[in-house]
Each structure stands twice: as structure tokens, then as C-alpha cells.
Amino acid sequence: MSSQICRSASRAARSLLSSAKNARFFSEGRAIGAASVVHATGKVPQYASNFGKSGSGFVSNSWITGLLALPAAAFMLQDQEALAAEMERTFIAIKPDGVQRGLISEIITRFERKGYKLVGIKVMVPSKGFAQKHYHDLKERPFFNGLCNFLSSGPVVAMVWEGEGVIRYGRKLIGATDPQKSEPGTIRGDLAVVVGRNIIHGSDGPETAKDEISLWFKPEELVSYTSNAEKWIYGQN
């Protein structure tokens, strides 16, 4: 279940609970239990229809129906910090050719315009040994040595970006490894011509992202913060 659904369910559930805060049905947490069972089994349990009574009469059936309809009721008490923890992080590097061609701001702008958040950045010239660690999964390929020589040939802008779906969509923003096969609108499709000079690298999965971030950055070099734009990007209130 996406965190967007969780957020929507959380807001709706809190509204329902606030409107019915004096009802024993809600104060005893029975609504949460009933909704959780409905979400897990697809069936309304018998007890759910019997818990509408309170000391002052019957709780409005519309409130009960509305609450039981929430598919994410089990998550409705998650706060903003818990949701922030669901954000992915990915490693993105602008290679020496991208740096030398003055494309740093262009590439950063594309990620920012999408709504992703920069949480780590540095400029460095990696050694060949460091480049070999970065490309360790390609060490059996015939082009491995050339890749390492090129990555260590000049300055690299190493970055960590954060956001929902940033690993998968970051790859889409970058485009195919071969710029000739990259769609127009992607970074490589618009700004690169040949495979050997495709200007940018991006993690291809969660485990790769974790490994590459830990290789290029120390934990204290990454920051965690809430951007003022997040409520406009993700709909958080």
C-alpha cells in the first residue's frame, strides 16, 4: 500500500474520530479493530454491527460505514515522521564528462523539478581503486578497466536524492545506458550521444542504492530535513 493512500486514510480517519470523539464506539478503539479486520479479510465482522451503541443512543451509521470503508485504517495513526521514514534514497553521480560540459545545474534542476529532495552532495576525484569498488559488479566485463579509468579521470559530483519512488523514477529521468536508445526528455536522451560518455550514473535498485550511498558518503554527510515544498508535492497537511 502506498504511503499516499496511508496519508489519505490517516486524514480521513482522524476527521471521523474527531467528529465522533464522545462516542464509546470510537473511544474504545473498536472502530480501528473492525476496520482492520475488514481490510484484512474483506468481510465485515458481526461484532462491527453491534458496537454502534453508546450511552446516549446509537452512533450514526454513516460514520461507522465511512470508517469501515477505509482500506488503510490500520495505518491511520501514523504521524509525519513515520511517513518520512518511508521515503527512498538513491545515489546519483554526474560523471567527469557531465561536469566538464557544465551540466551540473541542468541535472540537479531536473530532479528538483520532479519534487525530489537533495540530502547529500560532494565533488571529488575518485581514485581508480575507488572506481573499481563502485563498479565491482562489472569486474568480469571487458569494458571494466575503461569504465574505472574514465570515472577516475576527473571530478565527479556525487549526490543522494530522497523521495517517494526516487530509485525507480530516477532511472527513468536518467534514461537508457545507451543515449541513442534513450527517450527524448530524459537526461541522456537530451544531453548525451554515446555510451562511453553518458554523463550520469544512478542506482538501479534498493540494495544497490544502499551500497553505493555507503561507499560514497559517511552517515554524517547526509542530512534529514522537512522541505517546505513537501506538503505541495505529497499532499501532507
From Swiss-Prot:
CDD domains linked to this entry: NDPk_I
Transit peptide, residues from-to: 1-84
Annotated ATP binding sites: K95, F143, R171, T177, R188, N198
Keyword Oxidoreductase tagged: no
Keywords: ATP-binding, Chloroplast, Kinase, Magnesium, Metal-binding, Mitochondrion, Nucleotide metabolism, Nucleotide-binding, Plastid, Thylakoid, Transferase, Transit peptide
Pfam families named among the record's database cross-references: NDK
Cofactor(s) essential for the protein: Mg(2+)
A GO cellular-component term linked to this record: cytosol
Source domain of life: Eukaryota
Location in the cell: Plastid, Chloroplast thylakoid lumen; Mitochondrion intermembrane space
SUPFAM superfamilies in alphabetical order: Nucleoside diphosphate kinase, NDK
Catalysed reactions, as listed in the record: a 2'-deoxyribonucleoside 5'-diphosphate + ATP = a 2'-deoxyribonucleoside 5'-triphosphate + ADP; a ribonucleoside 5'-diphosphate + ATP = a ribonucleoside 5'-triphosphate + ADP
HAMAP family: NDP_kinase
Task performed by this protein: Major role in the synthesis of nucleoside triphosphates other than ATP. The ATP gamma phosphate is transferred to the NDP beta phosphate via a ping-pong mechanism, using a phosphorylated active-site intermediate. Shows the highest specificity towards GDP.
Alphabetized NCBIfam families for the sequence: PRK00668.1
Family as reported in the entry's similarity comment: Belongs to the NDK family.
Listed PANTHER family: NUCLEOSIDE DIPHOSPHATE KINASE
Protein name, UniProt field: Nucleoside diphosphate kinase IV, chloroplastic/mitochondrial
